[in-house]
Swiss-Prot record:
Broad class of enzyme this protein falls into: hydrolase
Protein encoded by which gene: astE
Co-factor binding details: Binds 1 zinc ion per subunit.
Record-linked NCBIfam families: arg_catab_astE, PRK05324.1
Species of provenance: Pseudomonas fluorescens (strain ATCC BAA-477 / NRRL B-23932 / Pf-5)
Entry annotation: catalytic residues: 215
Name of the featured protein: Succinylglutamate desuccinylase
Task of the protein: Transforms N(2)-succinylglutamate into succinate and glutamate.
The protein's required cofactors: Zn(2+)
């Protein structure tokens, strides 16, 4: 196998490859761009016009997605998977990956869409570099642009595999992309309705890609992801890469639960208190009238929405950041 196929090994060791560019036996060009970043380019005659960005390790302890990208890259480097798409593989936070931690100083996935410009430290610099790499990759005109940012969660979930679909004013969510997610094993999709500062929101809003944050299960250390089933996603990614996807009309939204954001719970001060058990699962339902959280100046979050559920509750975030999202069921009306 070509040395550049071992991007994960190089990244965890903090090493640069001796050769920055290599060719597979069937003419696929692999080019190391910077730490944790590798571009894969098919022969021109085989290129189907898709630019696919696959990112993982934005949080360093979310290892199942990292291992998935590692397997795909190994298959390409060995010649077992023959891409027809251009692909950019990104490991988001190499230093946190080496430490086995979510982040070192600050959460990289809260530093996109310009947020890094008002911050400092190496993770702010990394967010800036990731934006630059993505912008360069998606700079070629007249090509399809698709970005999957792969994650696992710090807590359990009543719906284990789900996606978050970013929002941009004047742009509709795509039924075709939702059906593709369903075929990849996603059980639910959260249709967002306001700007965001995560990586997928940057590539969706600023670069025009169809972009998604994919949550694949619970975060576990390297080598301990037997309980995270990514078979359907891995199969669909291989089909996207080698151009063997079934016709779009064969995919459907059957069984896919749709949700929209009702409110975000923002932590304003150190007095913030979230009235939820520490081990509550994502997508847990909350009754109307339930006191969800309190903060300074008698700020109270009381459940008003029928069918409300909570995802990503985290009272330990920094002040000014989101400490949870209240979501409600949505319909497929308005999809493009």
């Amino acid at each position: 196998m070509l040395a550049l196929g071992k991007l994960l090994e190089l990244t965890l060791a903090g090493r640069e490859p001796a050769e920055k560019t290599q060719l597979t036996v069937d003419g696929v060009r692999m080019r190391w761009l910077s730490e944790g970043a590798l571009e894969v380019r098919p022969p021109e005659a085989r290129d189907n016009g898709l630019d696919l960005l696959l990112s993982a390790g934005i949080h360093g302890n979310e290892t199942a997605p990292i291992e998935l990208l590692d397997r795909l890259l190994h298959d390409i480097a060995r010649g077992d998977l023959k891409p027809r798409a251009r692909i950019l593989f990104l490991f988001g936070n190499p230093e946190a990956m080496r430490r086995g931690e979510r982040f070192v100083e600050q959460d990289v996935n809260r530093l996109f869409n310009g947020r890094h410009e008002s911050s400092s430290g190496f993770e702010a610099l990394r967010a800036c570099e990731l934006e630059r790499l993505a912008a360069s990759f998606f700079s070629q005109p007249d090509r399809q642009r698709l970005h999957y940012d792969l994650h696992t969660a710090i807590r359990g979930s009543k719906i284990e595999q789900f996606a978050l679909y970013p929002w941009k004013d004047g742009r509709q969510h795509s039924r075709r992309e939702l059906a593709r997610l369903r075929a990849a094993g996603m059980e639910a999709v959260l249709l967002q309705n306001k700007p965001s500062i995560v990586f997928s929101a940057y590539t969706y809003d600023q670069l025009g890609a169809e972009s998604f944050t994919l949550e694949l299960g619970k975060a576990r250390p390297f080598g301990q992801n037997q309980g995270v089933n990514v078979e359907r996603l891995e199969t669909r990614l291989k089909q996207i890469i080698d151009g063997s996807e079934p016709p779009a009309e064969q995919d459907s939204l059957d069984g896919l639960q749709l949700f929209s954001v009702a409110r975000e719970v923002i932590k304003h001060s150190d007095s913030f208190h979230l009235h939820l058990p520490a081990d509550i699962e994502n997508f847990s339902e909350l009754e109307v009238g339930y006191l969800l959280a309190e903060d300074i100046a008698q700020t109270r979050w009381v459940i008003e929405e029928t069918g409300a559920r909570i995802i990503f509750p985290n009272p330990k975030v920094k002040n000014g950041l989101r400490a949870g999202i209240l979501i409600v069921p949505a319909t497929a009306d308005g999809l493009a």
